[in-house]
């Protein structure tokens, strides 16, 4: 993988975009779509521009935060999601500031892989689907940027409903 965000190197999900119809549809879920081999080399990520490092990092973060607050959670999903959240919290800013920081790139690659795997052992919530609709209509909108745009209102809704306060506290601690 050349970026740290989608986690697609370890899951069986993808997105198909049809710009002619403004559709962006998630597809997959079949065992036959699991990758056979994943090469996750942080050195390949060293030249990714800072803003795309940030967008991809937030994509990885939101895969895990969505999964962590979803009802489809387990000990396994909690473990990989919290590992991803912790690594994003500690290393994303460093990777954005200095793309050649290999320690930060390595930890972001790990966070990305764990976030991808979190979709195998858990699930995303509706935030990703909502963003797909946005970037389907606005083809120049990077996916991670769209997620950032809606994240405050999205997560505020769950906080105000007090539906998973303990999970938000655990995520905040993991983020540092």
Where are the predicted features?
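A general structural signal for well-ordered alpha-helical segments in protein cores
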Residues: 58, 85, 127, 147-148, ...
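Glycine-rich phosphate/pyrophosphate-binding beta-alpha loops
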Residues: 5, 113-144
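Gly/Pro-rich interdomain helix-loop hinge
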Residues: 137-140, 144-176
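A glycine/threonine-rich phosphate-anchoring loop and its flanking beta-alpha core
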Residues: 2-75, 170
């Amino acid at each position: 993988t050349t970026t740290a965000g989608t986690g697609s190197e370890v899951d069986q999900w993808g997105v198909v975009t049809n710009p002619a119809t403004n559709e962006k549809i998630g597809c997959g879920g079949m065992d036959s779509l699991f990758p056979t081999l994943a090469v996750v080399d942080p050195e390949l990520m060293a030249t990714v521009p800072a803003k795309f490092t940030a967008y991809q990092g937030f994509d990885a973060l939101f895969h895990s935060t969505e999964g962590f607050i979803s009802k489809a959670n387990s000990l396994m999903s909690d473990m990989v999601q919290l590992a991803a959240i912790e690594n994003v919290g500690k290393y994303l800013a460093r990777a954005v500031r200095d793309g050649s920081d290999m320690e930060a790139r390595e930890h972001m690659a790990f966070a990305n892989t764990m976030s991808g795997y979190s979709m195998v052992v858990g699930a995303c919530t509706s935030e990703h689907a909502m963003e797909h609709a946005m970037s389907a209509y606005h083809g120049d909108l990077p996916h991670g940027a769209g997620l950032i745009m809606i994240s405050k209102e999205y997560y505020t809704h769950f906080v105000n409903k007090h539906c998973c306060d303990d999970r938000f506290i655990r995520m905040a601690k993991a983020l540092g």
